[in-house]
From Swiss-Prot:
Binding site for Fe cation 2: E190, E243, E276, H279
GO molecular function: metal ion binding; stearoyl-[ACP] desaturase activity
EC number: 1.14.19.-
Chief place of localization: plastid
Quaternary structure annotation from Swiss-Prot or TrEMBL: Homodimer.
PANTHER family: ACYL- ACYL-CARRIER-PROTEIN DESATURASE-RELATED (PTHR31155), ACYL-[ACYL-CARRIER-PROTEIN] DESATURASE 4, CHLOROPLASTIC (PTHR31155:SF22)
Protein name: Acyl-[acyl-carrier-protein] desaturase 4, chloroplastic
Cofactor note: Binds 2 Fe(2+) ions per subunit.
Entry keyword set: Chloroplast, Fatty acid biosynthesis, Fatty acid metabolism, Iron, Lipid biosynthesis, Lipid metabolism, Metal-binding, Oxidoreductase, Plastid, Transit peptide
Keyword Chloroplast: yes
Metabolic or biological pathway, per its Swiss-Prot or TrEMBL entry: Lipid metabolism; fatty acid metabolism
Family statement: Belongs to the fatty acid desaturase type 2 family.
Cofactor: Fe(2+)
């Protein structure tokens, strides 16, 4: 699960310009472009350096909705989610690949098993072949690959977030309930993604692995913020969006790797994208089933997720040198992903349109409250709005000089931002 988000995926252009002391230089036009696109992909995290997070108060919560009504709605959501355990057993668990037939990172990398001279020679030859392919990969694609790998490596955070969703969580760590088995199986399959990308990058010799590893360390330490993390509705919607975004991101990276002659990397990203596609199918089907059972609750939850923006799982990544907001490492990485075509504003608009159509939001009628109908109207008009904003951002960007940024991941080499 990585996206520059969605994600896994992607925010906007930034202007962390290339200069020896890493100071920021930006034009007002570029800053406006960043803010516009940043609003499309994800809201800034509350816990930014030098700023206190908003404080939850009972008064604020009560102002949003009467406490008894909100609590009752949450209990109903949890019970509906729990009622799907048999459905999950029949429809979602078969999407997970049995371990004995699943691919493993070792399948795509030179064999490092100890042995005689022939084994060592074969390993050395395999690494040389991998490095020859990696040598042709442009720096902007490497930045996207590292950003996706860093996000994948923060898997412990995502499993802990999954276990906060009431009705879906693994309450004991070994629960036999289908929802819990799905979460553990999903985690096990996702764990291979970061492992495989990490080992490829290590063997490629193209990146500063210590800086990359320190970025993973910081992301795990910093954590992740998510709208309504205890809500099963929000959690399943978020999962569907994230998995589709990562499928798109890894798929585009595979295409770019192939175009630049790295067949090994193309195969690696392709097999990861295929996993994300299966996982997307699970979360999408589960969300679709909930739309059938509680169309009003799901329409309002989907609108909540869209209004709050789909916060990227890697949004709090840091290499220890970056700033806040448009100068953050995540914003710069996302700007490169936009320019490289790994994950773009157009992809995000297509993604929103896909789910609104897939869950038949426009066709919802019976059972919608006034708030549900307002959510429906908002959702059905969202994709066209995103596309208009994207077109405006690109017209503005065309009138300004592209910025450059240095990335510690690639030994401070400069890369052009979107």
């Amino acid at each position: 699960m990585a996206s520059s988000g969605l994600a896994v995926a992607a925010t906007a252009s930034s202007a962390w310009l290339c200069c020896p002391n890493h100071h920021i230089h930006t034009s007002s036009s570029r800053s406006r472009k960043h803010l516009l696109l940043h609003g499309l992909y994800g809201s800034a995290p509350a816990r930014t350096r030098g700023r206190r997070p908003p404080v939850w108060t009972a008064a604020a919560a009560t102002a949003a909705a009467p406490a008894d009504t909100a609590a009752s709605a949450r209990r109903e959501q949890v019970e509906i989610a729990r009622s799907l355990n048999a459905w999950v057993e029949e429809n979602m668990l078969p999407l997970l690949t049995p371990v004995d037939s699943a691919w493993q990172p070792h399948d795509f990398l030179p064999c490092s098993a100890a042995g005689g001279g022939e084994a060592l020679a074969a390993f050395t030859e395999g690494v040389a072949e991998l490095r020859a392919g990696a040598a042709g990969v442009p720096d902007e694609v490497l930045v996207c690959l590292v950003g996706n790998m860093v996000t994948e490596e923060a898997l412990p955070t995502y499993q802990s977030m999954g276990n906060r969703a009431e009705g879906l969580a693994d309450g004991t760590g070994v629960s036999p309930l289908p929802w819990a088995r799905w979460l553990r199986g999903w985690t096990a399959e996702e764990n291979r993604h970061g492992d495989l990308l990490n080992r490829y990058l290590y063997l490629s010799g193209r990146v500063d692995m210590r800086q990359v590893e320190a970025t993973v360390h910081r992301l795990l330490r910093n954590g992740m913020e998510m709208l309504a993390p205890a809500s099963p509705y929000h959690g399943l919607i978020y999962g569907a969006f994230q998995e589709r975004a990562t499928f798109i991101s890894h798929g585009h990276t595979a295409r770019l790797a192939g175009q630049h002659g790295d067949r090994a990397l193309a195969k690696i990203c392709g097999v990861i994208a295929a996993d994300e596609r299966r996982h997307e199918a699970g979360y999408t089907m589960a969300s679709g089933r909930l739309f059938e059972l509680d169309p009003d609750g799901m329409a309002r939850a989907l609108a909540d997720v869209m209004r709050g923006k789909v916060t990227m799982p890697g949004q709090l990544m840091s290499d220890g040198r970056d700033g806040d907001g448009e100068h953050s490492l995540f914003a710069r990485f996302s700007a490169v992903a936009e320019r490289a075509g790994v994950y773009t504003a157009r992809d995000y608009g297509d993604l929103v349109e896909h789910f609104v159509r897939r869950w038949r939001v426009a066709e919802l009628a019976a059972g919608l409250s006034g708030e549900g109908r307002r959510a429906q109207e908002y959702l059905c008009g969202l994709a066209p709005k995103i596309r208009r904003m994207e077109e405006l951002a690109h017209r503005r960007a065309a009138r300004i000089e592209p910025a450059m940024a240095r990335f510690s991941w690639i030994f401070d080499r400069p890369v052009m931002l979107g």
